[in-house]
Every structure is written in structure tokens, then in C-alpha cells.
Amino acid sequence: MQLTLPYPPSANHYWRHVVIGRRASTLLSKEAREFRANVIAAVGVTPPQLTGRLGVCIAVYPPDRRRRDIDNIQKPLLDALGHAGIYADDSQIDRLETTRECCVAGGKVEVTVTEL
């Protein structure tokens, strides 16, 4: 399965921590909720539920030339793909390859998921 998705928020901006009274909670940020909705829309109504061991190739096209750690977008992206129903859990992934490509306006990621 191949998908072209918007550039995801980094792991540093994916979750937010809130304290209500004495209780602390970790919630998805607004950026993360919007990104998940975009991934679900790109996958479609009936996603293929892959059940075996998986390989994932991610091509990252950053929105600008700022220095970024490309591993900071892996976890949010993989979680969103699982939430969209591509696979049951990202623990199914045995092979993961991430490459940084040239900058494009707005940024994007191209994801290929294959069964091994």
C-alpha cells in the first residue's frame, strides 16, 4: 500500500500534557488530531487490515530547510497509520526505513507498507 500524506507534527508536538486539579493527563494536540483525520481520509473508508509482519518505507519531504531529526516523525506517523486501520498495532513492523528527500512547499511524506 502506498500513501502520500501531509507532513506530520513531530513527536515533540504530538502530545500535550494537562493538569486538572491533582490529576495529570496526556492528550493528543490539535495538530495531532488534524493529522490523524487527514490520514484516515487518505486511507479511505475500508482500509486493508494487514495482519502479518510488515515493512514500512517512509520518504520525508520537509517543508523547509530547518534542521530536523527525521526520527521525530516516525512514531506519530506510525501511530496514525495504525489508528486509521492499516494494521492492528505498530509492533507488527519488523523493517522500518526512513529517508529525507528534498524540500517541498508545505512538506509531505510518502509511505509504502508491505507484508514481509
Per-segment meaning from a language model:
Residues 1-116:
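Acidic, proline/glycine-enriched N-terminal capping motif
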